[in-house]
């Protein structure tokens, strides 16, 4: 893992957006990463998106790291996994 990119264990389920959101620190600056519950369940199966996220955390954090290195933030500074 790149030491300049750190993922604290503070993921949440955002009911309004139907999304798992998880913070990331990039050189000390906080960004938000997100993946929809629908995408999580389609990719990994299961029935509870937050549990599925936790079970697949390492792969999802690696994917988010790649997007961050490629500067794939949206206009709001969020990094969306698909």
Role assignments for model-derived ranges:
Residues 16-44:
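A short, structured beta-strand/loop element
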Residues 2-6, 46-82:
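Acidic, low-complexity intrinsically disordered segments
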Residues 9-11, 17, 35, 44, ...:
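Solvent-exposed, flexible loop/coil residues
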Residues 1-23:
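Short, charged/polar N-terminal "headpieces" of proteins
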């Amino acid at each position: 893992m790149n030491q300049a990119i750190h993922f604290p264990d503070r993921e949440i389920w955002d009911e309004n957006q139907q999304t798992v959101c998880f913070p990331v620190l990039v050189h000390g600056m906080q960004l938000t990463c997100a993946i929809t519950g629908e995408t999580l369940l389609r990719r990994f199966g299961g029935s509870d998106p937050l549990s599925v996220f936790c079970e697949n955390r390492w792969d999802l954090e690696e994917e988010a790291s790649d997007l961050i290195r490629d500067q794939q933030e949206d206009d709001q500074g969020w990094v969306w996994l698909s």
